[in-house]
Amino acid sequence: MKITFYGHASLAIEVGGKHIIVDPFITGNPQAAAIDINTLKADYILLTHAHGDHVLDVETIAKNTNAVIVSNAEITSYYAKKGFNSHPMNHGGSWKFDFGKVKYVNAIHSSSFPDGTYGGNPGGFVIEGEHKNIYIAGDTALTYDMKLIPLRTKLDLAILPIGNNFTMDVEDAIIASDFIECDKILGYHFDTFGYIEINHEESIKKFFDKGKDLMLLAIGESIEL
């Protein structure tokens, strides 16, 4: 399983011979100017919620690739009405795709499209593929619901927001890593705007002091599990 960071909360995942894009917000992020969305491969586009900084480039990528949009029922209905392929899910449900299993789990946030359309309840994803398990939290506060995840799944990596203001901060993300019983964390949703700027060295040290590994990738950088 290969995971590439495209800035903010945008990710690419290669697993089971398939290409997945998560929450594409690339053209609106000056820090990701080197990423050409017209060259991205996508069999699936996973969306945690409907905010503009998570869905800006969905339609362009979906048109280019004919990817299947996977999200909650409200978000997939929104795109299905526009003619896009979609697979609806909802909280607590899972589905076996051709690359692995996806479960849609709870997040505490808000969710509406830039045009005001209701975007359903926000969520996150637990993905199981190639004998590796990851958790993509989406935009969320710290929540006791996270404690449910390790009851069913032993995680190899968790991708957690750490920018504060709109989501958890670093301290809450450390507690979240305890809840999900995963000490290998990829941080995201930071530094894109002034509201969510972080001190990288301090953040990494705070995790290290708790015996945990916080990775902060450069845009375009990848890790493999």
Curated annotation (Swiss-Prot):
Taxonomically, which superkingdom? Bacteria
What SMART domains does this protein's entry cite? Lactamase_B
Mind listing the UniProt keywords for this protein, alphabetically? Hydrolase
Would I find Hydrolase among this entry's keywords? Answer: yes
Report the Pfam families cross-referenced here. Lactamase_B_3
Single annotated GO MF? hydrolase activity
- Keyword Hydrolase listed: yes
| PANTHER family per the UniProt record, alphabetical | UPF0173 METAL-DEPENDENT HYDROLASE MJ1163, UPF0173 METAL-DEPENDENT HYDROLASE MJ1163-RELATED
Recorded hits in NCBIfam families, A to Z, give: PRK00685.1
Q: What is this protein called?
A: UPF0173 metal-dependent hydrolase Fjoh_2786
